[in-house]
Structures are given as C-alpha cells and as structure tokens.
C-alpha cells in the first residue's frame, strides 16, 4: 500500500461559481455559448480603444511596423454597466463609480458565486480566486490616453 504524501495545502471545495466574460454575464450564459459552439470575440469598438484605429492597425499582416498592430480582434465585455446593480454591495456609490470595470466584473462574479454556494453566512472560511490576463485595464488605458495621446 503506498503512503499518501501529505500536502502543505489545505483541501479546497469549490462551492460556487460566477463569471463575467465576453458575451456572457453568468455561468449559465457561458455553458450556453459552449453548447452552441459560439465564439464571443469581436473587433474593438471606438469605446474600447478611444483612438482612431486606422492610425494603429497595419494592413500588412505579419510585417512588423513600429507603433502598429495587425488586429483589433479580442474578447471585449460589453453591456455590463446596463445590468450591474451597485445596490447589492455594501460599498459607497462614489467608490463604485470610480472603480475600473475589471473590479466591478470581479465583484459581480464573486456575488454570483456566493449566491450559488448558499453559504453567505459562513464567510470566515470563504476565499476568492480571480483570473485576469495582464492586459491593461480600462483605467490604465485612460491614464495612458491622458498623457500619451495628448502628445500624438
């Protein structure tokens, strides 16, 4: 009989899920997208980039050009603000208005996970695992716009 190696990590139970992703606002939406085989990526809109895309996009695919990119295609979360209910959080409205959308998405996903877990009263043993690629947030992009785009 093999000896079970002791782990220094405590066991984890995933008891709730939540997500905000391109094209979906809930885990059920995500499963529907998967079941239908849909792809929810799209081209950037003016609201996504706040800059004339023609200045940045190259029509020479695969050829490196300084300050140019080959695609504006990506996974953009759209319409979230139309459905976000700030009153469900015990935070000051002014603070919520100042937060970058990536933080609001995280708050909403955590709210969904807690609701699904049905253990909202047992928070002392509750943790959150967040995933986010290291792309700039909208707030970071606005900061860059205020400084760099004025120089262009």
Which positions does each model-derived feature cover?
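Cys-dependent condensing catalytic cores that perform Claisen condensation/acyl-transfer
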Residues: 2-152
């Amino acid at each position: 009989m093999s000896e079970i190696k002791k782990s220094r990590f405590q066991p984890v139970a995933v008891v709730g899920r939540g997500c905000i992703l391109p094209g979906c606002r809930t885990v059920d939406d995500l499963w529907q997208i998967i079941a239908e085989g849909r792809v929810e990526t799209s081209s950037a809109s003016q609201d996504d980039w706040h800059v004339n895309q023609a200045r940045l996009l190259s029509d020479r695919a695969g050829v490196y050009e300084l300050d140019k990119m080959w695609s504006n295609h990506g996974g953009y979360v759209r319409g979230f603000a139309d459905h976000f209910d700030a009153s469900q959080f015990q935070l000051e409205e002014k603070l919520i208005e100042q937060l970058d959308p990536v933080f609001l998405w995280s708050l909403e996903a955590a709210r969904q996970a807690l609701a699904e877990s049905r253990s909202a009263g047992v928070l002392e043993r509750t943790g959150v695992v967040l995933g986010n690629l290291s792309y700039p947030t909208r707030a970071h992009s606005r900061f860059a716009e205020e400084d760099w785009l004025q120089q262009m």
